[in-house]
Curated annotation (Swiss-Prot):
One of its GO terms (cellular component) is extracellular region. This is Short neurotoxin 1. It comes from the Eukaryota. Belongs to the three-finger toxin family. Short-chain subfamily. Type I alpha-neurotoxin sub-subfamily. It comes from Hoplocephalus stephensii (Stephens's banded snake).
Length: 81
Protein backbone atom coordinates (compact mmCIF):
# COMPACT_ATOMS: atom_id res chain seq x y z
CA UNK A 1 0.00 0.00 0.00
CA UNK A 2 2.84 2.40 0.84
CA UNK A 3 4.49 1.62 -2.49
CA UNK A 4 1.29 2.40 -4.37
CA UNK A 5 0.88 5.70 -2.53
CA UNK A 6 4.50 6.68 -3.22
CA UNK A 7 4.07 5.80 -6.90
CA UNK A 8 0.96 7.98 -7.14
CA UNK A 9 2.77 10.92 -5.54
CA UNK A 10 5.71 10.62 -7.95
CA UNK A 11 3.41 10.34 -10.98
CA UNK A 12 1.45 13.40 -9.82
CA UNK A 13 4.61 15.48 -9.42
CA UNK A 14 5.90 14.45 -12.85
CA UNK A 15 2.55 15.07 -14.56
CA UNK A 16 1.97 18.45 -12.93
CA UNK A 17 5.57 19.52 -13.60
CA UNK A 18 6.02 21.05 -10.16
CA UNK A 19 9.57 21.91 -11.11
CA UNK A 20 11.52 25.11 -10.74
CA UNK A 21 10.13 28.35 -12.11
CA UNK A 22 11.94 31.64 -12.70
CA UNK A 23 11.00 35.05 -11.39
CA UNK A 24 11.84 37.70 -13.97
CA UNK A 25 11.49 41.47 -13.87
CA UNK A 26 9.00 42.73 -16.44
CA UNK A 27 8.88 46.50 -15.96
CA UNK A 28 9.55 48.71 -18.96
CA UNK A 29 12.29 51.38 -19.06
CA UNK A 30 12.30 53.43 -15.83
CA UNK A 31 8.97 52.15 -14.44
CA UNK A 32 8.82 50.81 -10.86
CA UNK A 33 10.06 47.23 -10.53
CA UNK A 34 7.50 44.49 -11.21
CA UNK A 35 8.09 40.75 -11.52
CA UNK A 36 6.47 37.77 -13.17
CA UNK A 37 6.74 34.04 -12.48
CA UNK A 38 7.84 32.33 -15.69
CA UNK A 39 7.94 28.78 -16.99
CA UNK A 40 11.02 29.61 -19.08
CA UNK A 41 14.49 28.97 -17.64
CA UNK A 42 15.85 32.44 -18.42
CA UNK A 43 15.08 36.16 -18.27
CA UNK A 44 15.99 38.91 -20.73
CA UNK A 45 16.63 42.63 -20.93
CA UNK A 46 16.47 44.36 -24.35
CA UNK A 47 17.80 47.89 -24.73
CA UNK A 48 17.67 50.24 -27.73
CA UNK A 49 17.63 53.94 -28.52
CA UNK A 50 15.00 55.88 -30.45
CA UNK A 51 13.60 59.43 -30.54
CA UNK A 52 12.33 58.98 -26.95
CA UNK A 53 15.78 58.05 -25.63
CA UNK A 54 16.94 54.70 -24.28
CA UNK A 55 14.15 52.11 -24.10
CA UNK A 56 14.43 48.99 -21.95
CA UNK A 57 12.15 45.95 -22.14
CA UNK A 58 12.34 43.06 -19.67
CA UNK A 59 10.65 39.67 -19.60
CA UNK A 60 10.81 35.88 -19.63
CA UNK A 61 12.83 33.74 -22.02
CA UNK A 62 15.59 34.80 -24.40
CA UNK A 63 14.12 36.16 -27.65
CA UNK A 64 15.80 36.83 -30.97
CA UNK A 65 16.44 40.51 -31.69
CA UNK A 66 17.05 42.71 -34.72
CA UNK A 67 20.42 44.37 -35.32
CA UNK A 68 20.93 47.46 -33.18
CA UNK A 69 19.10 46.04 -30.16
CA UNK A 70 21.23 45.02 -27.18
CA UNK A 71 20.08 41.76 -25.57
CA UNK A 72 21.14 40.34 -22.21
CA UNK A 73 19.85 36.90 -21.16
CA UNK A 74 20.44 35.43 -17.70
CA UNK A 75 19.40 32.41 -15.63
CA UNK A 76 18.85 33.52 -12.02
CA UNK A 77 15.81 35.07 -10.35
CA UNK A 78 15.33 38.78 -11.09
CA UNK A 79 18.69 38.88 -12.89
CA UNK A 80 17.32 41.18 -15.60
CA UNK A 81 16.69 44.19 -13.35
Amino acid sequence: MKTLLLTLVVVTIVCLDLGYTMTCCNQQSSQPKTTKTCAESSCYKKTWRDHRGTITERGCGCPSVKPGIQLECCKTNECNN
